[in-house]
Amino acid sequence: HQGVAGILNLIQDLRKRNFTKSFTFNSSARYALITKLAGIKERYQYPLFEKKKQNIIETARKFIYVHLNKTVESNPILNIDENKVLETKKKYKFDKEYCHILLGLGGSGPTKRVPVEKFIKFMDLISTNKKCKFYLAAGKNPIEQEIINKVINSNHNANCLSLGFMDISETLPIIKNCNLAVSNDTSFSHISAALGVNTIVLMTDTPLLYGNYSTKMTPVLPEGKTNVTHDSLGKEKINPEEIYIKAKKILNL
């Protein structure tokens, strides 16, 4: 639904569903226009043009409380079928001999993708403490598939499994079975934390709050930085040694 054609398609899709009420967790005038033209009578949305002033957690909590009279915590939980988790554990041999680590290698843009060499260096370091298996998560686009291929072609290829072309229904129980996640600030960091997996989030170019709102999240910042935000451009300064130190602490290695 990108561009003018995408907007028109989205309006058409919404009209077909005859929604009577909408809640828009965004300050964009584009979404305000879309929901109006879709014929939705009751439209609730964040205040327009106030994105820079917003705390993503508190703004959402207040919005939900005001319009739905519900109090929500900032520690989201994603529940999946326990039988599916156990089946996956058996299918992919999640045994205790190994430490099972999800690597969130992708990102919504190039400034959020920490160079893959830094992930490989972390893999080298953590593998000196315990045998590890790595589960490689990224998008299906050619750029991110190339990143996955670089990891698979490293010295760790025998202990890697790509999740790149799996359905989400197959991916979630795999992530749930992991002992740790190390991820760029991408959807996989939010998913793994919500599944209850301790997650190290590599913060390079977005507000720190995106990577520490959950008790399951441990942020790693660019060297020399005590905070990050939009346009911090810190991906080259993420230190694999720091990831390793925090991973050892979380895993009690």
What is the meaning of each model-derived region?
Residues 1-253:
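Catalytic machinery of carbohydrate-active enzymes
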